[in-house]
Curated annotation (Swiss-Prot):
Family: Belongs to the CcmL/EutN family. CsoS4 subfamily.
Protein name: Carboxysome shell vertex protein CsoS4A
One of the Pfam families matching this protein, by short name: EutN_CcmL
NCBIfam families for this protein: carboxysome_A (TIGR02703)
Keywords: Bacterial microcompartment, Carbon dioxide fixation, Carboxysome
One BP annotation, GO: carbon fixation
BMV domain segment(s): 1-78
Practical applications according to UniProt: Expression of 10 genes for alpha-carboxysome (Cb) proteins (cbbL-cbbS-csoS2-csoS3-csoS4A-csoS4B-csoS1C-csoS1A-csoS1B-csoS1D) in E.coli generates compartments that resemble Cb, contain RuBisCO and have its catalytic activity, showing it is possible to make artificial, functional Cb using these 10 genes. Cargo proteins can be targeted to these organelles. Artificial Cb assembly in E.coli requires csoS2-csoS4A-csoS4B-csoS1C-csoS1A-csoS1B-csoS1D (but not the gene for carbonic anhydrase, csoS3).
Segment forming the signal sequence: none
Complex formation: Homopentamer.
InterPro entries reported in the protein's UniProt record: CsoS4A (IPR014076), EutN_CcmL (IPR004992), EutN_CcmL_sf (IPR036677)
Domain comment, as recorded: The tight homopentamer forms a pore with an opening of about 3.5 Angstroms in diameter which is positively charged. A short loop (residues 30-33) protrudes above the center of the concave face to different degrees.
Length: 83
């Protein structure tokens, strides 16, 4: 698992059918770090600190072993100082 922060929503209306309509968010480990795109499985907002999983765990967390994701948000952290 990784601790990451949600930077903003990513709008992508034209997708492959397997992705469905799950929200996509831009996340990073800290401001200035490389950005990544994560599937939002729980309903996050920009500024939230979240727990993310990758690889096959990301696909299963998104709802299916065949889901095309390599990063999925699985939890919102209630308190985190960002260090």
């Amino acid at each position: 698992m990784k601790i990451m922060q949600v930077e903003k929503t990513l709008v992508s209306t034209n997708r492959i059918a397997d992705m469905g309509h799950k929200p996509l968010l831009v996340v990073w480990e800290k401001p200035g770090a490389p950005r990544q795109v994560a599937v939002d499985a729980i309903g996050c907002i920009p500024g939230d600190w979240v727990l993310c999983v990758g690889s096959s765990a990301a696909r299963e967390a998104a709802g299916s072993k065949s889901y095309p994701s390599d990063l999925t948000i699985i939890g919102i952290i209630d308190q985190w100082n960002g260090e």
